[in-house]
């Protein structure tokens, strides 16, 4: 179990520690509470029979966050590029390949030897023979705890990062200034007056804005302004944005109180300037599409800016408030251990009923049956 941390602003907080804060609600929880109500409990860690969702590889998204928000140096320190077979055209892949290479060099070996044993023979007796398994093993030893990306992904990431930083609107947001320190994955943990634990993780906190990178996912191909608008609405990103605005306000309080953890001296000095020098800020999403050479998808970056106090900020705040009210009501009714359910009032179809079900017009059949008067009399 992760260590339970005190309220405060955290930099460089491990993902497992952030998500491991027992009972702390994040913005994704609020979106589920608003959109699914009681269904939130069933997908939460409170449900002992919860089924972990299948997650596709997230390394590309993590790497994009790192190279765009923290810079190339941070990306290269955190990620390692996997060996690519194309860079080792003469590598021995199969046992038969290794045997053939040893035979060419007149090296003696046991015919019944395992593949790994033959690789060791190559290391000692024929070091000029490249064994693919040995390349991978050496890479594993070298990479340590770093995450990995493929050679193709590394190239794509660098192209996308360059596109962001050279963008006429978004690029200047990331431009270095005296004392500027990149702030990525800013974690905020706090407690509401009624004891509800909260958490938020800001992709990047810049003086002029809070930024969030989002995947376009399976883009339908419709015009991007329409597609992105639908994504924001469907995924509850307006709620998330409003919650991030609230979290940043809390973060400013923690900065003033000295409740900042995990920051370097340079990061701490930079953070201390925010409350006075950046009292108001905007918000931007950077939607991206991962390139796919096979499907013919280009890397796409689609930035969206919103001012503090916008209409969607207001809508999102209302939804976040409603989500917390749902949480309070259900916790009071069911508690954390009993499954959350909902039984609606008895409804009727008849017109004028207080609780009415509304049928679609196409349910009607205009053709009378010969015996219908007798049948329904």
PLM feature spans:
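Metal-dependent nuclease catalytic cores that hydrolyze phosphodiester bonds in DNA/RNA
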Residues: 1-199
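Short alpha-helix boundary/capping segments
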Residues: 52, 56, 229-239
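Extracellular structured ligand-interaction cores
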Residues: 59-61, 199-201, 208-210, 280-282
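Hydrophobic/aromatic-lined pockets within catalytic cores
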Residues: 68-73, 192, 215-218, 249-253
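Secondary-structure boundary elements
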Residues: 174-177, 206-212, 249-257
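Short helix/strand-bridging catalytic loops that position acidic/His residues to coordinate divalent metals
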Residues: 192-193, 219-235
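Conserved catalytic cores of phosphodiester-cleaving nucleases, focusing on short active-site segments
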Residues: 200-227, 244
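Metal-dependent nuclease catalytic regions and adjoining charged, substrate-binding loops involved
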Residues: 233-238, 243-377
